[in-house]
């Protein structure tokens, strides 16, 4: 069959590369990176580390959310399928640096991603684009530098939800826990006609005051505004029906 013939041909190529000490390049897709053992171990270890440090969930579920939100944003604004795929790959990998250290995790993640991506059949330009997006996603050291990084930033910083709070007694919640737990509803809406990206939050003010929310998230929301500007759009934030940003 055709499939059997392709398998035999692939095996011959691998054997040839082993004999001649040449690298076997693997075509890359979002599906592939989601099933990359090294990437998933880094995400698992990073999430464990952050759990011990008291941070909210940064598991694969968060990374999938970021990847798919970034892709949705670019798709709505008619970016190419190629750019969308790069954003999904960068979005899924963006937090691998937490396995090394939370501080400068974006830069560590970029360095790790650069080495991991070398085993795939990616152009140098695409690899650098992904690495740059990962390295610039943290509000303390980065910012949007191109549409891929801009979409990743918005996908990451708008992932505010109750389910990201780890299971623990409510009495032990810190401000980050309270802020996320207080968000009872979150929607990200994209109006392509008006070129507006809107984050709409419903916050239980009995759990967290609006002041506490902005104490934690103001810089992240301002980063989203900068990312939206790069995309040629406007970022708006609404909390409990009132326009905030």
Which residues are covered by each model-predicted region?
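Short hydrophobic transmembrane-like helices used for membrane targeting/insertion
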Residues: 8, 13-14, 24-26
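An active-site-proximal "capping" alpha-helix that borders the catalytic cofactor pocket
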Residues: 67-70, 105-119
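Histidine/acidic-rich helix-loop-helix segments that form or flank divalent-metal centers
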Residues: 123-184
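Terminal helices and disordered tails flanking the catalytic cores of nucleotide-processing hydrolases
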Residues: 159-245
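Short alpha-helical catalytic segment bearing the HExxH-like zincin motif
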Residues: 87, 91, 108, 134, ...
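Acidic/His-rich, divalent-metal-binding segments that scaffold phosphate/diphosphate chemistry
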Residues: 27-105
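Extended, compositionally biased eukaryotic interaction scaffolds
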Residues: 35, 44-54, 75, 79, ...
């Amino acid at each position: 069959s055709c499939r059997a013939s392709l398998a035999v041909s692939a095996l011959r190529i691998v054997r040839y590369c082993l004999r001649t000490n040449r690298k076997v390049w693997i075509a890359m897709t979002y599906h592939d990176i989601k099933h990359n053992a090294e990437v998933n171990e880094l995400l698992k270890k990073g999430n464990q580390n952050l759990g011990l440090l008291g941070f909210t969930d940064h598991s694969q579920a968060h990374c999938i959310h970021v990847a798919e939100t970034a892709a949705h944003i670019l798709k709505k604004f008619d970016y190419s399928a190629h750019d969308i795929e790069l954003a999904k790959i960068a979005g899924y990998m963006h937090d691998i640096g937490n396995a090394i250290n939370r501080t400068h995790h974006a830069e560590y993640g970029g360095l790790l991603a650069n080495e991991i991506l070398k085993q795939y059949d990616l152009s140098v330009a695409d690899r650098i684009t992904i690495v740059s997006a990962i390295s610039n996603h943290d509000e303390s050291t980065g910012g949007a530098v191109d549409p891929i990084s801009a979409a990743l930033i918005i996908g990451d910083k708008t992932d505010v939800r109750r389910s990201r709070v780890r299971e623990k007694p409510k009495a032990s919640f810190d401000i980050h826990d309270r802020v996320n737990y207080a968000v009872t509803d979150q929607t990200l809406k994209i109006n392509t006609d008006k070129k507006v990206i809107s984050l709409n939050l419903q916050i239980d003010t009995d759990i967290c005051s609006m002041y506490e929310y902005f104490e934690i998230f103001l810089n992240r929301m301002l980063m989203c505004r900068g990312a939206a500007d790069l995309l040629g759009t406007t970022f708006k934030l609404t909390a409990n029906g009132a326009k905030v940003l």
